[in-house]
């Protein structure tokens, strides 16, 4: 699982290293590499790529691409660790949106944990002059779109091959990126080409390691360890981009992680209790 967090953090580092390129151009190259990996994986698994739930797959691709685009915008314009922290709100939106899409319920105590997490975001915006309200809203919107995309993935998990779902996200991102890039194309130079490839490669590696961890470990444990990525974000931000953090901003990041982690732990325990009660245990 730690390999997954390192891989995703490295992908974010390379996004920031090519921040002089248009965000949609970065999306296009990221999805180009991802599409190649997915087709290879599907061919190896002897699975079809078209899918049978076209509407849900398309919507998953649209919301996933939108989330990715706005996340890249935040990474380009605010400190790396701050952008990653705001994106960590996505599980909260996933749970809230599931109330409407999947008819799931949220316990009262979970709302308290969500409030703790959002208060952390306000801390970051209030005490870090590099994080404007504009990019804060963009980051939150990215997390919201991720929440919608995750719910669509959950609705498809019993009906489509996982790589088919991922592939449609990559294809939508590739097509959208190509269209937008026609109007704002900027030729990458030198190391840019390598960085763009590594964005896609590390993102795909992160997904592979994450999937492997979910298959071997409890989902709650994986979710909690995933937030250790913030440590790598802080370290790489300081080492490569000379991004220091005030104590107040660090406190805000901790509040976000604590709020989300407590929500994950509580939700998993409630699910286990409900299963025991359902079986009469």
Where does each model-flagged region fall?
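Glycine-/small-residue-enriched transmembrane alpha-helix faces in small-molecule transporters
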Residues: 1-25, 130-155, 275-281
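Membrane-interface interhelical linkers
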Residues: 1-6, 35-59, 108, 158, ...
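Hydrophobic/small/kink-forming positions within alpha-helical transmembrane segments
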Residues: 5-9, 39, 61, 65-69, ...
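Hydrophobic/aromatic residues within transmembrane alpha-helices
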Residues: 18, 26, 30, 74, ...
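Alpha-helical transmembrane segments of compact multi-pass small-molecule transporters, enriched
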Residues: 33-37, 86-100, 115, 171-176, ...
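Helix-helix packing/entry segments at the starts of transmembrane helices
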Residues: 83-89, 156-171, 207-238
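Loop-to-transmembrane alpha-helix entry segments
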Residues: 87, 103-123, 129, 133-136, ...
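C-terminal-most transmembrane helix of multi-pass membrane proteins
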Residues: 231-281
């Amino acid at each position: 699982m730690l390999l997954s967090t390192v891989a995703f953090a490295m992908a974010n580092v390379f996004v920031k290293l090519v921040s002089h390129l248009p965000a949609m151009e970065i999306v296009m190259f990221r999805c180009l590499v991802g599409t190649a990996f997915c087709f290879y994986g599907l061919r190896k698994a002897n699975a079809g790529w078209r899918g049978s739930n076209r509407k849900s797959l398309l919507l998953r691709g649209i919301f996933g691409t939108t989330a990715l685009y706005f996340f890249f915008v935040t990474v380009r314009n605010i400190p790396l660790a701050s952008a990653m922290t705001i994106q960590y709100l996505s599980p909260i939106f996933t749970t809230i949106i599931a109330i409407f899409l999947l008819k799931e319920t949220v316990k009262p105590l979970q709302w308290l944990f969500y409030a703790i997490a959002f208060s952390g975001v306000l801390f970051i915006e209030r005490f870090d002059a590099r994080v404007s309200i504009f990019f804060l809203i963009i980051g939150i919107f990215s997390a919201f779109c991720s929440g919608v995309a995750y719910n669509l993935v959950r609705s498809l998990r019993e009906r489509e091959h996982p790589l088919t779902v991922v592939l449609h996200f990559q294809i939508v991102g590739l097509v959208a990126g190509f269209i937008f890039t026609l109007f704002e194309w900027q030729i990458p130079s030198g190391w840019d080409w390598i960085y763009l490839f590594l964005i896609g490669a590390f993102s795909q590696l992160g997904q592979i390691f994450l999937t492997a961890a979910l298959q071997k470990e409890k989902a709650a444990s994986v979710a909690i360890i995933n937030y250790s990525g913030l440590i790598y974000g802080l370290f790489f931000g300081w080492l490569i981009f000379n991004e220091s953090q005030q104590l107040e901003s660090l406190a805000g990041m901790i509040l976000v992680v604590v709020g989300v982690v407590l929500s994950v732990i509580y939700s998993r325990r409630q699910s286990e209790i409900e299963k025991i009660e359902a079986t009469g245990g």
